[in-house]
Amino acid sequence: MLKAQIQTGLQLLQRAAVSHMRPSSCTSMLMRMRVHLAPRALQSQRSLSSSEFSPLIADAILPKCSSCGVLLQNEDRSKPGFYLAPGSSRDFRKETDVVYEKHLASLEEADRDLLLNGAQGLQVSGQKETPKSQKQPANKVSCIRCRDSHYRSQFPLDQFAVAAVSDVMHSIPAYANLAYVVSATDFPMSINEDVFRHRSPREMQFVVTKNDLFFQKNSVASKYGLQFYQDYFWRMFNVPVENVHCVSGTVDWNTEKLFDSLRDNTYFIGCVNSGKSTLIQSLVHLAHKRRLALPNAKRDRALQKIDNQVISTQQEPKTRQALIKHNRALASAFKKQNGPGASYMPGFTRGNLPFELSRSVTIYDVPGFSSAQTAQLYDFLAPQAIKALHKGQKVYKAGTYKSHYETLKSGQVLTVGGLFFLQAPKNTMFQVKNLISHPHHIFKDMEKAMDVWRSPEIYPALKNVFVVPGTRNNAPTPLVKHIVPSFYGSIDLVLRYLGYVSLKPTGAKDPESGPLVVYLPKEVDAIIRQPITKYISRTLSGRDANGNVLRKENWVQKSVTEVKRYTGKTPFTSRLIPAVGEDASADEAEVMERCVEKIKGHAVAHAQISEETKYANWL
């Protein structure tokens, strides 16, 4: 039955094309078909083959939320996809006005005239009100969840479920092209290699987003950032360099090059909050600008008329700053109106949304994926905390060798919002730079940190230190102890989705000191990596202008700067070593060495780590 109705709809569309029906009439017809077919489409969506109908035609007939892509229905408000059919709405009426009108209407005409004393009375409830104008196009329909998220900041967690990799990949046709969107914030943690079980990485395009957090200028991102990403994907996954892009959807960096490289039926996949929807908004806006650049006599006449009015009225032209601000506001409004919905809440996109960039290229926004464990992180974080954390830190300001740092000393504990607790071993000292969008705090020891975290009511001055609650369901939030593999020099402690903390040991090395220990909530995933700044920006090389090796105390004054190339000869990342059960109370160095030897077949004693063996214990 549903199939026959859709075929009828397709025939109507063909007749409309033959008879040159006006676009507005065609849109109205589609909307009537959407409302009529919505309940049956929702019940029978799995029975339809994606290859039987054009995706754009099917999207026009089967009602979808224009913001998140879920199939719409108007029968059950408690189920996903519920929406209010577009139509005229009445102005808001105060309760006091309603009561006043009721009593005014009950009066006789003479008493009413005496009360009003010649003034015009309020409109009585029985009179017809003027409906509000339709503010959004008829084909832009959003579900209740998206409307509440955008306009009321309401985020029911049960409606922001995060999909698994297998579910997302099975929803994509086998013939589709893939663009894997990777976030620079936690690079390379947002590369989920489970995707490569379904498709070869050589067949994909890799788009690294959010590079405005790493680079101050697009020219630097295009020079150093793109070079590093191309090196990394070639060395790790054998991806051709032309399939790697360094972009920013927020500020429209390098989107034109990406636009020109896209093929038809390209699906944008990636982890949650990797910037897919924001990037597609930028591409949709770019397509709009290219269409406007085409010759159009009617538009040119309208612009000429506006210019003539400005000249005749002698209006002062806008300043350059005002014009830039005005154009940015117009671009932002267009992206929100015509692109997919973008939100800092993970799991916002719930269905595959098509967007036609040109007559020959259609792209799709796809729901983000994540593992079941790491997705639980958002179950106990407040929406405002999630928004602040995903804002990101400017690496070119806070993450370079010239940036300000804090000092973490022996026995002290560093935390960023309770997302982790990093304890410095005895007789050690570290320079710390926080690249997570939340203030850090240093406690004198682990006991004090746990006391404040789990009893915040006793320390009201520190109530804003934590975003992760210390207790859940009247029980302490469990932490898992992890050991950081031995390293020599600086490293980055990277947290999935959130950013990283730069750690640089200082002072003479004590052979009796143990490895770093970090305590994580079970929902938080972390790794260590080589400092990414040495591959994407100019850093100290440790040599003078003549190529002579310098002592470390002379680096800042005499060292030249350089940008290193990633060769793949050394490991770029390493996972942490969990210490659970009996290992939780054992010597950290022994636990680490035993684990490394079990996995790799050999290990280097922590006290013997040097420049030559600094990656020997990385896993």
From Swiss-Prot:
Please list the coiled coil stretches.
none
The residues forming the transit peptide are 1-55
Specify the domain of life of the species encoding this protein: Eukaryota
Q: Which GO terms describe its molecular function?
A: GTP binding
* Segments passing through the bilayer: none
Query: Where can this protein be found?
Result: Mitochondrion
GO cellular component terms, alphabetically, are: mitochondrion
SUPFAM superfamilies under this entry?
Answer: P-loop containing nucleoside triphosphate hydrolases
Q: Which UniProt keywords apply?
A: Mitochondrion, Transit peptide
**Domain (CP-type G) ranges:** 162-372
Q: What does this protein do?
A: May be involved in the mitochondrial lipid metabolism.
| Assigned protein family | Belongs to the TRAFAC class YlqF/YawG GTPase family. GEP3 subfamily.
* Protein name in the entry: Genetic interactor of prohibitins 3, mitochondrial
